[in-house]
Amino acid sequence: MGTTTTADGAIRVYWMTGCSSCLRTKEFLQKHGVPFLSRNVLEDESAYAELEQFGLKQVPIVTRGDTWANGQILRDVAKLCDIPYGATKMLPVAEMRLRLDAVLAGAARFLAQMPDHALAQMLPNRPRSFAQLGWHIANIADAFLEHEDGIPLTFDSYMRVPVEEDSGRAQLIAYCEEMRVRMSAWFEGPGRTRDWSARADVYYGEQTMHEFLERTVWHAGQHVRQFMWVLEGLGIAPDRPLGRETFDGLPMPEKVWDEADPAKLRRSA
């Protein structure tokens, strides 16, 4: 397979199916009428080879000639692609805390509805099982607390998967509930005096702690939307589904999945 040159000045987006920030990045460019070359790293092995020219092996990445921006920071993408980008408004920390708790509670509730035989089923066009998706929701919050214990957030922090003994429905539900308790304890303890304007030690660029918390909340929120979509694809109505009261005001993608057709889950079962 030939290697595509990236020295032509075209805008390229490197992404993978099911990645919340990847979907948001593509939607951002589409919304502003910016054409781009789509480079799905799960489908084209040469895509990662192109990223290696920049010393990168992560997504989402937007490149233009010999410069690049991490798609998780839209203001950097806007600068790279000559898109006007004004000030953004974030929800208060106290509200984000409530939203994250609702997301974790929802994840536990939806996991309780998942048939045991379906946990090992894979998401369409993504090597991630339904069980791993549920675990990932809780692990996003866990990565936030790791950061607060002095462990920097890396790309691999979000690529972890549970060991087999932690992949059962009961264990996954317990993990979500554990993270609700731990997050509440943190907010009632160290979180009370946290400087939310301080810089977060994250791999994707300059972010304040407030921005990192927002990323944590909407990231987990997008994946819980995917889990509800999974249930619908299995013919199961989500128990007390999360809606606008949980997601409004968060910078989430509009779509749930790159091709959000739950019937595809039924056809692939």
Question: Where is each model-derived feature located?
Answer:
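Non-catalytic, surface beta->alpha helical segment in thiol-disulfide oxidoreductase systems
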Residues: 64-87
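Acidic/histidine-rich alpha-helical segments that form the ligand environment
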Residues: 99-111, 164-200, 207-228, 260-269
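Structural micro-motif
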Residues: 52-63, 72
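Thioredoxin-like thiol-disulfide oxidoreductase module
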Residues: 39-57, 81
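Short, contiguous alpha-helical
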Residues: 118-162, 201-262
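Short, charged, low-complexity loops and linkers
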Residues: 83-96, 164
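Local sequence-structure signature of Cys/Sec-based thiol-disulfide redox active-site neighborhoods
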Residues: 2-35
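Alpha-helical bundle segments that constitute or directly flank the non-heme di-iron/ferroxidase center
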Residues: 91-114, 135-147, 178
